[in-house]
């Protein structure tokens, strides 16, 4: 189906279509629907099955999202612990009473996911992309879970063993083929001897197989294990030792990995990566007194870090005395928690067990209400990452003939959309 073609008469002139003809022409309906704002589009999927098929089609979705920025709904926050990953010298194992995949729910969808019991089957959190969730138990079992269909798929077992690694999930959206995904595993070597190679194994949903490759770097490189990276338009950003960021373009035929120094190289308490609204990499850090957020931009042919904003926590709470008094933030440490998805003017911060949103333009702080076992979490030893879902109707990612395992059903696909 072409989203731009117009119905024409035999003389090549656009015809005066009747209402009935317009409603029964997919091409004409596409041209009308693409002019409507997202909040209207989300309601129109309920009109008929045919309208849902048009709106959920890869062609229309790709064209529409090129015109209108996609909205993302916060489902909740996953609590990620690296204490039990890899081979532990001290033999530490997760206690039975401690969940492997805790979710601090902020939405009705998150509540249903938590109550469905599916999180108990997926292992540990690894990464997410547009709501698609990557979890597993290193180094053998990895699962993908789609919130739109409540289905999960187990990936084939990787062919290469990495003692320590970092992983990323890459979602792809083609106007012709629709959604697909890739999973990238990269080896992390603790003590490299001037190694300029990084071993990588990639799974593609298009081929349903793992492929092995070695990436070349122009300087010695050692990736940081078990740390969440960031994927922007197929480019993977991973933390590397020595205050660096490794950059790997998964779409490039060149088997290389680049490196850029972070704007600050000290050992800060918190370091997070994110994406700006124009598709650039964001880097944020915080210590006990301040936080900074930087943007990676290309100036000519050189990548440079530019400071977006710097916030003094003491001054911030002074401007938000009502919130500070309510949650007694004066006597507790404040930290940068995470960056918003494709936004530069909002960040998540944490003070004790409370999560807040800081608005950089208005300098205001608002509390984030969530459900979860906040009192039992060891916050200082866990990474808390936001879990977003793109609020857009889509066709199932996993086909019926894909490898599935039983999933408790919940009504997540129809609850709480923006």
Curated annotation (Swiss-Prot):
SS bond partners: none
InterPro entries registered for this protein in UniProt: At3g26010-like_b-prop, F-box-assoc_interact_dom, F-box-like_dom_sf, SCF_F-box_component
F-box domain segment(s): 18-66
NCBIfam families assigned: F_box_assoc_1 (TIGR01640)
Name of the protein described by the UniProt record: F-box protein At5g03970
Taxonomic placement: Eukaryota, Viridiplantae, Streptophyta, Embryophyta, Tracheophyta
């Amino acid at each position: 189906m072409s989203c731009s073609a117009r119905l024409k008469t035999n003389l090549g002139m656009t015809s005066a279509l009747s209402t009935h003809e317009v409603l029964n022409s997919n091409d004409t309906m596409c041209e009308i629907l693409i002019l409507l704002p997202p909040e209207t589009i989300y309601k129109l999927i309920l009109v008929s099955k045919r309208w849902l098929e048009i709106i959920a089609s890869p062609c229309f979705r790709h064209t529409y999202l090129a015109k209108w920025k996609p909205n993302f709904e916060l489902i909740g926050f996953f609590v990620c612990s690296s204490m039990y990953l890899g081979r532990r010298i001290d033999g530490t194992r997760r206690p039975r009473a401690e969940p492997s995949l805790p979710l601090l729910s902020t939405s009705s969808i998150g509540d249903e996911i938590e109550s469905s019991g599916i999180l108990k089957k997926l292992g540990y959190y690894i990464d997410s992309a547009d709501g698609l969730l990557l979890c597993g138990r290193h180094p053998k079992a990895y699962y993908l879970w789609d919130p739109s269909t409540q289905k999960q798929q187990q990936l084939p077992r990787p062919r290469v063993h990495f003692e320590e690694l970092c992983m990323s999930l890459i979602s792809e959206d083609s106007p012709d083929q629709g959604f697909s995904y890739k999973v990238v595993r990269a080896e992390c070597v603790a003590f490299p001897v001037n190694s300029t190679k990084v071993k990588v194994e990639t799974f593609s949903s298009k081929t349903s197989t793992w492929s092995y490759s070695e990436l070349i770097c122009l300087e010695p490189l050692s990736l940081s294990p078990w740390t969440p990276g960031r994927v922007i338009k197929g480019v993977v950003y991973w933390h590397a030792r020595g205050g660096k960021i490794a950059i790997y373009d998964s779409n490039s035929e060149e088997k290389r990995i680049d490196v850029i120094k972070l704007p600050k190289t000290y050992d800060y308490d918190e370091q997070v990566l994110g994406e700006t609204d124009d598709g650039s990499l964001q880097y944020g850090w915080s210590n006990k007194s301040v936080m900074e957020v930087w943007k990676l931009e290309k100036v000519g042919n050189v990548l440079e870090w530019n400071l977006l904003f710097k916030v003094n926590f003491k001054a911030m709470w002074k401007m938000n005395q009502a919130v500070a008094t309510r949650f007694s933030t004066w006597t507790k440490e404040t930290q940068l928690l995470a960056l918003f998805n494709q936004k530069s003017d909002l960040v998540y911060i944490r003070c004790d067990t409370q999560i807040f949103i800081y608005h950089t333009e208005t300098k205001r702080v608002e509390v984030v209400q969530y459900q979860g076992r906040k009192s039992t979490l060891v916050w200082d030893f866990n990474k808390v990452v936001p879990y977003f879902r793109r609020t857009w109707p889509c066709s199932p990612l996993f086909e019926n003939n894909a490898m599935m395992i039983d999933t408790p059903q919940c009504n997540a696909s129809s609850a709480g959309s923006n």
